[in-house]
């Protein structure tokens, strides 16, 4: 009986987690979370190759597309090739894509290894970073409830426009994102 209850609780938890993955209906939550922030929080962390990174990473690019994702999220994994194409395109304009795999916060080596394998399989090689879950940036990443979620950050670390909630494979989402990117690059 005890095993059955544990199994049912696990199944319910997974069902709730996967129902949030790619859910566009909860976009209001993101407007609230990101609207309260003027800039991406300061952080110190590492990329998936072990290189030290901090918020100055944004100063290296005219615009940075920051994508929040996790390994078990199908829409997140499905959009990795699209994000790689965006990264290639943005690099020509002085921009970049950076991934934040929320499962890898605190540097969980198993999750990072699995994420790297997923990215390799999907043909994605853009930079992914992690930092302490208890940092302000970690708290922001942990507040994301629907995945994937994508935001734009300018070279001063300011969050630009509204977050794009859900996969970028649809025309509407890409058009919205491209409009925001063009607006920043035009300034």
List PLM regions with ranges.
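Positively charged n-region of N-terminal signal peptides that target proteins for export
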Residues: 1-5
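C-terminal motif of bacterial Sec signal peptides marking the signal peptidase cleavage site
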Residues: 16-20
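N-proximal helix/coil linker or "cap" segments that precede and/or mark the start of modular domains
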Residues: 21-42, 59-60, 116-117
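Structural microenvironment flanking redox-active thiols in thiol-disulfide oxidoreductases
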Residues: 78-121, 133-138
């Amino acid at each position: 009986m005890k095993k059955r209850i544990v199994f049912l609780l696990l199944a319910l938890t997974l069902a709730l987690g996967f129902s949030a993955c790619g859910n566009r209906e909860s976009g209001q939550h993101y407007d609230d979370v990101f609207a309260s922030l003027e800039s991406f929080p300061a952080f110190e962390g590492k990329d998936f190759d072990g290189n030290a990174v901090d918020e100055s990473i944004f100063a290296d690019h005219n615009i940075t597309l920051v994508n929040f994702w996790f390994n078990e999220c199908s829409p997140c994994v499905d959009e990795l090739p699209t994000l790689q194409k965006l990264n290639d395109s943005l690099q020509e304009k002085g921009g970049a894509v950076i991934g934040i795999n929320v499962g890898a916060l605190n540097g969980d080596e198993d999750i990072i290894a699995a994420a790297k394998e997923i990215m390799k399989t999907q043909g994605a090689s853009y930079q992914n970073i992690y930092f302490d879950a208890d940092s302000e940036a970690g708290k922001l990443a942990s507040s994301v409830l629907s995945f994937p979620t994508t935001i734009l950050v300018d070279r001063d670390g300011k969050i630009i426009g509204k977050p794009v909630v859900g996969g970028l494979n649809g025309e509407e989402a890409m058009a919205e994102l491209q409009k925001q990117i063009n607006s920043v690059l035009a300034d």
